[in-house]
């Protein structure tokens, strides 16, 4: 643990991210649909040291992961065994390892959409449920808080669908509920 850090969650772990360098904390793994609006289908909370591909493989083996026709994943999901397992379950797992070398290809265009879609889903979830700062510590407590936020997002999405309201108007409902509680 680096010296000088305050208020550290001692249950959390350090791991090296290809995107952010060394990070301390936990990991939320999301699978989502993009159309007609971003919504989580699957969520798993785990220590930061647990690999995403491990979680995906375990969820597939236990039939906990909804298999979609197409799953766009980053390079951590690109192992041949995992790609084959996902295909065996009826889906296509597209990762950088499956992309052709030529820059102009429909597979590359399709894969480029991954960054926009997953980042949008995480951003909407963080904003809607105010997840910038978690008020709890520990794997179980933070996991409960974060997974309850994912569940709330899913429930409000479904309610919007059934009520013929705009699907992505989730933050507005949560903000209105907060306002009513405060009043």
Indicate residue ranges for each PLM-predicted region.
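Polybasic low-complexity intrinsically disordered regions
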Residues: 1-75, 80-88
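Hydrophobic side chains within alpha-helical segments
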Residues: 55, 119-122, 157
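Helix-centered, glycine/charged polyanion-binding patches within enzymatic domains
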Residues: 75-140
């Amino acid at each position: 643990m680096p010296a000088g850090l305050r208020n550290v969650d001692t249950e959390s772990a350090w791991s090296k991210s290809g995107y952010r360098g060394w990070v301390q904390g936990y990991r939320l793994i999301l699978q989502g649909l993009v159309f007609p609006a971003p919504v989580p289908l699957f969520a798993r909370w785990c220590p930061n040291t647990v690999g995403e591909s491990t979680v995906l493989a375990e969820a597939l083996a236990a039939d906990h992961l909804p298999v979609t026709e197409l799953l766009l994943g980053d390079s951590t999901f690109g192992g041949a065994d995992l790609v084959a397992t996902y295909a065996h379950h009826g889906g296509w797992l597209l990762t950088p390892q499956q992309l052709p070398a030529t820059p102009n290809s429909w597979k590359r265009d399709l894969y480029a959409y991954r960054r926009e879609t997953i980042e949008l889903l995480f951003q909407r979830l963080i904003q809607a449920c105010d997840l910038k700062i978690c008020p709890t510590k520990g794997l179980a407590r933070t996991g409960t808080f974060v997974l309850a936020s994912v569940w709330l997002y899913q429930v409000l999405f479904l309610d919007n669908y059934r009520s013929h309201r705009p699907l992505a108007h989730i933050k507005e409902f949560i903000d209105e509920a907060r306002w009513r509680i405060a009043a």
